[in-house]
Amino acid sequence: MNIKTFSIGGIHPEENKLTHEAVTQVAALPKQAIFPLSQHIGAPAKPVVQKGDKVKVGTMIAEAGGFVSAPIFSSVSGTVFKIDTAIDATGYRKPVIIINVEGDEWEESIDRSDKLETVEAHPDLTPEKIVECIKNAGVVGMGGACFPTFIKLTPPPTAKAECVIINAVECEPYITADFRLMMEKADEILIGLELLMMGAKVTTGYIGIETNKMPAIELLTKKCAEKFNGSKYNVEVVPLKQRYPQGGEKQLVDAVIQRQVPAPPAIPVNVGAIVQNVGTAYAVYEAVMKHKPLFERYTTVTGKKIKNPGNFLVRMGTPMKDLIDACGGMPEGDNKLLAGGPMMGKALTSVEVPICKGTNSVTVISDVEARRKEPQPCIRCAKCVGACPMGLEPYLLAKISEVQNWERAEQEDIVSCIECGSCQFTCPAHRPLLDNIRQGKSTVMGIIRSRAAKK
């Protein structure tokens, strides 16, 4: 087996894949669903419903607020309670639509059957129609970045797509939602990949999976041979070394096709690759073949102190508390609640934060694990430099961010940081490297945007 990986940096944190074998359960409907209007990169969605309106499962409740945006659909049936603000996964109050749940009535246009729909059975499908279906269904990147999928399939004239790479790496500790999705919905994922290749007008596809998911590698390799042998598509399952952050977009492109994505504003399609999460491929299948907009997703609920950790198919808008309760409740003592995993997840201030399009995990870290050690002076060991998958100097970026030298930070390429946390994980002095770099990167990007707007 030819095992590939990226060329610079990387670490190997403890996996803690506690729910690896936990078959996906369908989460119970919430009593009240909360839909933030910013569930994607770009402009927030605009409400198209009002207080008192009746909605069904699959009803559009907010339309795209601009070109880089995505519509939002109700995952429940019921009555719009109010349009208000609530704390979302960012920790800030953001506009939301709140719906009181009444029954489970779906829009009639959605195909709820288990029949596998193939591309061959739909000869009328064109690249333009596929992209339009994806756009209208509100499909975004399901790996956490939440970039509208249709935009990736329509690159600028200066870039030419050569392949689609499915990101099935799931290198973040604890999270197993993508693994369970692959084991349970392999056929649908491959049809989703086929649709993505059609939409991008390419015939080459790759599925990158880390070697700690051998059952998924074996299953998808077998399914690919059955589906694509003799077809015009060349699809390969690529086994990848267990190495964090193997699932980073640039690291995945490096590992799979040995091409380096330049610094921002360059994106993978500038070197010929369109990267989509495996959950996105499944959402594309459902959007195009089942006329089902994006309103539910596979999510892991996990933590060493969680009584019954598991994987769930959960309707968006469901409060995290409902999922934690379904797993036995919040453990006693002090805990840290994360939307996502321990490396790149966001710490939350409330268990009422709802599941959104990008929520791949609800992770509960116990007080002992969560407590940071007291930062010590830098010992100049350069471990952070060796760990950085972007070839940056984290100790330097953190220091110049701390003293607010934004011009120097931009010169040192702070905007190339992918915020993976490898530097902070490996630092023996427990320096808050990522904290400072993240703040510095945000400030520098704001300065760059402001400068561009004046031109």
Placement of each model-derived feature along the sequence:
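Histidine-anchored nucleotide/phosphate-binding helix
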Residues: M183-M198
